[in-house]
From Swiss-Prot:
GO molecular function: lanosterol synthase activity
Activity regulation statement: Catalytic activity requires the presence of ERG27.
Pfam families given in the database record: SQHop_cyclase_C, SQHop_cyclase_N
Gene Ontology cellular component list: endoplasmic reticulum membrane; lipid droplet
Name of protein: Lanosterol synthase ERG7
Temperature-activity note from the record: Optimum temperature is 35 degrees Celsius.
pH dependency: Optimum pH is 7.
Underlying gene: ERG7
Record localization: Lipid droplet; Endoplasmic reticulum membrane
Additional information: Present with 2193 molecules/cell in log phase SD medium.
Active site per the UniProt annotation: 456 (proton donor)
Length: 731
């Protein structure tokens, strides 16, 4: 079992044998900690055994592995799939994982419970502390925006506060080291906007030092381009409750612990700080997206308005408006909200409005557990309530692509994942007045309950379902979803394509682009880019093309229109290619990820290395980045700098991405591909597992996040494609 830093310094830990992950047919994930007596009669799933490093995990021992002289790509593919199927939860069909990386999620859970006077259960408290301690920077003891970031004020102050609220004393070596780093960076005064908001709610900062978030903007006509109903869904999801908190200037009652914290996180006494002069103070290490002059002027005008012009009528009207919007968010998502950041802010507002014993607040407490995920390092709040739909859609597709899906040993794996996707389709519309588009028929990123349509997830789910429905092997489950339900999904997907004046032919994430991209000049977050409005994303457009072309091949529904929509999407993909042949990826790292999706999309319309200059440029770029050992490796710095940066060593996931791209493009130099395939085979464990190497995902250019299933899914696909193209060997 791995020894972590928390173990070396003697921090308490729970018994990993007593944890059980519960899932249901809608994909909800929640952890329980049992008594030894309960655990004896409740065996863990193989996923739980693997994740928590239980020696009783049924480790596979395939006959042929990398030490066998005749070990083929298909052998490696089959071994990887045989291992991966053990990570599927039998009750739900999902492939659970700890979708972690961001270091600013857990503060909401801990702060809301502290403010509400709710004691976090001891087993959770212990593991929340362990996770934060185990993700501290190994040199200076601070924390960053994400788990592989340098130490920042934002990450360090929030996680320091969490540790103190959870009971770690200020003189504990972990706290002392982190506090030293925080003060060296200038103290909490340099925290970005979201940090200042949480500190103000905890009475550790003053609201006059927080840039405003006026709820009155929701009273403006929707026809105005700046109306917040036109913003990106995550941004408006956060700033609806934040605008309420900003309006009422909520700070929790002072306690002795908070008094201590006030004295620990600043470089000078709290009472001597002029907070109003520090609205724009952000530590240079934190600052990814500086304020525009436009935003600074707007903030100054709003501060003047709030101080001298806001009247009680407007105050009450705007307060009611945003709380009504919070209630629609809770209704549309059964209190999950779009993600944990806005869920925690919504919970705090609900606590203020309705009280700790209210049904609404208690439901939010229940739903907090959906994103609270345990792992070997400890427990953390994930980036969302999971990646259930995304991973299931890929698993089905890639098992088919690899020639595995119809083999008897994978029948249950495919059926279970397919059943989950059938259950995960949205079958209701949002509450009127939610500023939400039609969603019935679509799929989201995680679960049906979460309820937010995502374009590429809808497309990939449709493609996966059609693959199963086309196979006679799975005839017993074909009835679970009708063609008419797929048509509803296609209707939503087509409605998400940008065919107006914004980025013609592209697909964004959750909605069409509804406001000019120039709105980004009002980005207040300081640590993220591209958050104000929807943006066109090449990989979302690629996935949408994959779903539409596959559907178009087998159905006549809206056939001519779909043909046109595919054509204009392909035009956008080509237009998005950079002069060096690359595409910038926004949801995976980075140029390698986007290149894979782009070249697969172009393959679906018949474009290959031989007949397409776009494909040739894309392949030549990827080949130029191959490392000496035959693999590929790209750093998170690529996402931040918008320029390709090699990682320290080649990586399995990115090698698979590059190989998939080259195989779809029919790249003619087989030796290049062979070297990459050899790396995937050699990095595989004898059991079929690939070990974690580096973070795979990213969002908003600056925040890394892990996709643990990627190290199985994409190598399986790459090896399977290679085997079908070049090998006659069968298992």
């Amino acid at each position: 079992m791995t020894e972590f830093y928390s173990d070396t310094i003697g921090l308490p830990k729970t018994d990993p044998r007593l944890w059980r992950l519960r899932t249901d047919e809608l994909g909800r994930e929640s952890w329980e900690y049992l008594t030894p007596q309960q655990a004896a009669n409740d065996p863990p799933s193989t996923f739980t055994q693997w994740l928590l490093q239980d020696p009783k995990f049924p480790q596979p021992h395939p006959e042929r592995n990398k030490h066998s002289p005749d070990f083929s790509a298909f052998d490696a593919c089959h071994n990887g799939a045989s291992f991966f199927k053990l990570l599927q939860e039998p009750d739900s069909g999902i492939f659970p994982c700890q979708y972690k990386g961001p270091m600013f999620m857990t503060i909401g859970y801990v702060a809301v419970n502290y403010i509400a006077g709710i004691e976090i259960p001891e087993h959770e408290r212990i593991e929340l502390i362990r996770y934060i301690v185990n993700t501290a920077h190994p040199v200076d003891g601070g924390w960053g925006l994400h788990s592989v970031d340098k130490s920042t004020v934002f990450g360090t102050v929030l996680n320091y506060v969490i540790l103190r609220l959870l009971g770690l004393p200020k003189d504990h070596p972990v706290c002392a080291k982190a506090r030293s780093t925080l003060l060296r960076l200038g103290g909490a005064i340099g925290s970005p906007h979201w940090g200042k908001i949480w500190l103000s709610a905890l009475n550790l900062y003053k609201w006059e030092g927080v840039n405003p978030a006026p709820p009155e903007t929701w009273l403006l006509p929707y026809s105005l381009p700046m109306h917040p109903g036109r913003w990106w869904v995550h941004t408006r999801g956060v700033y609806i409750p934040v605008s309420y908190l900003s309006l009422v200037k909520f700070s929790c009652p002072m306690t002795p612990l908070l008094e201590e914290l006030r004295n620990e996180i600043y470089t000078k006494p709290f009472d001597k700080i002029n907070f109003s002069k520090n609205r724009n103070t952000v530590c240079g290490v934190d600052l990814y997206y500086p304020h525009s002059t436009t935003l600074n002027i707007a903030n100054s005008l709003v501060v003047f308005y709030e101080k001298y012009l806001r009247n009680r009528f407007i105050y009450s009207l705007s307060k009611k408006k945003v709380y009504d919007l919070i209630k629609t968010e809770l209704q549309n998502t059964d209190s999950l909200c779009i993600a944990p950041v806005n869920q925690a802010f919504c919970a705090l507002v609900t606590l203020i409005e309705e009280g700790v014993d209210s049904e609404a607040f208690q439901r939010l407490q229940y739903r907090f557990k959906d994103a609270l995920f345990h792992g070997p390092q400890g427990m953390t709040i994930m980036g969302t309530n999971g990646v259930q739909t995304w991973d299931c859609a890929f698993a089905i597709q890639y098992f088919f692509v690899a020639g595995l899906a119809e083999r008897p040993e994978f029948y249950n794996t495919i059926v279970s994942a397919y059943k989950f996707l059938c259950h995960a389709q949205f079958d209701t519309e949002c509450v009127p007045g939610s500023y939400r588009d039609k969603r019935k028929g679509a799929w989201g990123f995680s679960t049906k309950t979460q309820g937010y349509t995502v374009a590429d997830c809808t497309a990939e789910a449709i493609k996966a379902i059609i693959m199963v429905k086309n196979s006679p092997v799975f005839s017993e489950v074909h009835h679970m979803i009708s063609s008419e339900r797929l048509f509803e999904g296609i209707d939503v997907l087509l409605n998400l394509q940008n065919i107006g004046s914004f980025e013609y032919g592209s697909f964004a994430t959750y909605e069409k682009i509804k406001a000019p991209l120039a709105m980004e000049t009002l980005n207040p977050a300081e640590v993220f880019g591209n958050i104000m409005v929807e943006y066109p994303y090449v990989e979302c457009t690629d996935s949408s093309v994959l779903g539409l072309t596959y559907f178009h091949k087998y159905f006549d529904y809206r056939k001519e229109e779909i043909r046109t929509r595919i054509r204009i999407a392909i035009e956008f993909i080509k237009k998005s290619q950079l002069p060096d042949g690359s595409w910038y990826g926004s949801w995976g790292i980075c140029f390698t990820y986007a290149g894979m999706f782009a070249l697969e999309a172009l393959h679906t319309v018949g474009e290959t290395y031989e007949n397409s200059s776009t494909v040739r440029k894309g392949c030549d770029f990827l080949v130029s980045k191959q490392m000496k050992d035959g693999g590929w490796g790209e750093s998170m710095k690529s996402s931040e700098l918008h320029s390709y940066v090699d990682s320290e060593k080649s990586l399995v996931v990115q090698t698979a991405w590059a190989l998939i791209a080259l195989l779809f493009a029919e790249y003619p130099n087989k030796e290049v591909i062979d070297r990459g395939i050899d790396l995937l085979k050699n990095r595989q464990e004898e059991s079929g597992e690939w070990k974690f190497e580096s973070v795979e995902g990213v969002f908003n250019h600056s925040c890394a996040i892990e996709y643990p299933s990627y190290r199985f899914l994409f190598p399986i696909k790459a090896l399977g494609m290679y085997s079908r193209a070049y090998e006659t060997h069968t298992l």
